[in-house]
Amino acid sequence: MLHKYLKLICLLAAICVLCIISQNSTKIWGALKLPNSHYYSNTSMISSIPKMSVSPVKSLTETELRVKEILEKLDRLIPPRPFTHVNTTTSATHSTATILNPQDKYCVGDQLDILLEVRDYLGHQKEYGGDFLRARMFSPALKAGASGKVTDFNNGTYLVSFTLFWEGQVSLSVLLIHPSEGASALWRARNQGYDRIIFKGQFVNGTSHVFTECSLTLNSNTEECKYLNGRDQDVFYCMKPQHMPCEALTHVTSRNRDISYLTSKEKNLFHRSKVGVEIMKNQHIDVSQCNKSKEVKEKCQIGMKIPVPGGYTLQGRWLTTFCNQIQLDTAKISGCLKGKLIYLMGDSTLRQWIYYLPKVMKTLKFFDLHETGNFKKHLLLDAEKHTQIQWKKHSHPFVTYQLFSVIDHGYIPQEIDRLIGDKDTVIVITFGQHFRPFPIDIFIRRAISVRQAIERLFLRSPATKVIVKTENIREMHIEAERFGDFHGYIQYLTLKDIFKDLNVGVVDAWDMTIAYGTNNVHPPDQVIGNQINMFLNYIC
């Protein structure tokens, strides 16, 4: 009898367990769900079930901590500067510049220091720093120029230092690009939203073409396609078109959205008359050679630390201050490039390089890859010398009115991971201009991902050469909130911080384009030629 009761109790217990499992099956199987591996080439529809991370928790935590550290550093660099009236903001006209320890005679190699005291429109001395300034010295007749170094004492005074690199009459310039109140407003506005740019994705299914809105962030109110790079968690979303799969996305374009996060009062700081105003009017000095001996410098090599400024222009030629730079002729360039595989990864400022090179090396010919548009992959070949040079655009965000293909594009870290590398492989990287309209954390994460990909490359191929080209300065009066140089300067500082101590060569295009005074996102051929010559000095 006892045996029958025990069997009955076991049966009832089993029935209860089955009921519990049935009622909670979604939770149980959801908890056991294994992570999916996603790469950018894969597409998936957004579901309501949260997906587990594909990256190790440790590496994600390290990245998040690094992002947080950099953001905190930048927030300290650009503190909030609220103001009640434009009259209390920095005025170039009312500010003063005083040459310290003026000399009767200046010699090549001397340092010239200038004390800058900034005041507001009412003539009151400012009590804090943060103004976005640009210092430059130049001699138009000599086609000479160099940037100056600005030290902010955070009390309304600045030290502007120039190294006198050439003899002759030298003009001095310190531009107030934006007052500290404007810089603070741009920083706050930048990090408030992702919607200054509208992306449109083209989906193709046979003869049907449909455009839907795309974004770097998820709009949870609509059914969307998610394009995910699993390793670095880079993601791009598009609204899913009806009757088409997510895999049907072929092209993307973008437009500026009519939106601003600046107040009406703040917008007054960015009128053309208030951007790039000269503080030092008609200031110049005469510099003599003084028979000073020239310092003997070692050959330019990858991994060298670059001072500020890192060089200057004279007779239109860029001359470095930290290494012995050689002006390479056609024969030397030809010999250097023999057997080289060169990968240019980035934006249209690097595409200028691949357009310029055939003008110097007539044996380099474009190979037709049967792609269309300005942002197609470009390939230069010299079959006899076994030279290959490729330019490929970086992935999202890529801002352009022109339609570009997303069939064969990848994030720079992905492209680096696909390369085997060897002593004759060279990679050149640039990114930044297309990141300016978006919160800075996107740029920070991408820069960290690129660094990590380079470190992985060096593990499997330490002999591979990597060169980083920084951003060019661009048009002075372009829309400051979306594309202005203040955003570029913050990215320039961030990139230098993230890439410090990494064994790469740097073509400091920011410093170079200030020296040339181009103020053009696509500088003329003379500047491009000198950027390329600096690059060749690293690899030849």
From Swiss-Prot:
Tissue: Intestine, and to a lesser extent in kidney.
Glycosylation, residue list: 24, 42, 87, 155, 205, 291
Signal peptide: 1-22
Keyword Protein biosynthesis: no
Keywords assigned by UniProt, alphabetized: Glycoprotein, Secreted, Signal
Pfam families recorded: Neurexophilin (PF06312), NXPE4_C (PF24536)
Protein name: NXPE family member 1
